[in-house]
Amino acid sequence: VRDRISNLKPNEIGFQEVKNLRVNGQLQKTTAYETILKVELSKPILPKSKVLIELDFEAQVPVQIRRSGRDNAEGVRFSMAQWYPKLAEYDQQGWHPTPYVAREFYGVWGDFEVNITIDKNYVIGGTGYLQNPHEIGHGYEKYATLPFKPTQGNTLTWKFKAPNVHDFVWAADPGYVHNSKQ
């Protein structure tokens, strides 16, 4: 893997840059150490409590080498796993800040709300449940509880909810077709 990565051009290498992180709406101080982002919490997160963690980040989708990327060998435009900043798990043994270097990881289970804005010619398959079929079309509108209302412009925003999952994975391609049977 390292040989393939070292041969990539700058526009083919993936990266993520966290712009800011909020816990329950409050901005937190962060420091990056290679693939680890340390967060200095303004208040402790108590055991069995719930918090809302929001990240604003920029990323470049790499040419697919392993789990995630663009233009894979099967011809799929985007295959996206491990594509967002992941939280380290804290358990009975302490923190698990395992760096992401092409190996397995230890991660948090959680509830995801994900919005993906992409060219409207693409169809997305993603973890969880599509929340806005009435805006998407591509065959999903027949499952909508609201009347079909096509979005104006060249993009669509697909809104997913995925409860109690380990990762949010998605794939998108203009050649994908949504088929269903009843």
Question: How would you name each of these model-derived features?
Answer:
Residues G14-E17, N72, F78, P97, ...:
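Polar low-complexity intrinsically disordered regions enriched in Ser/Thr and small residues
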Residues I36-S42, H96-V101, A144:
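Short structured motifs
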Residues V1-K9, E58-F112, N179:
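Glycine/proline-rich low-complexity spacer/linker segments in large multi-domain proteins
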Residues P44, V61-P62, E74-A81, E135-Y140, ...:
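Short, surface-exposed linear patches
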Residues K86-G94, A102-Q182:
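Hydrophobic helix-coil surface modules that form long, contiguous segments used
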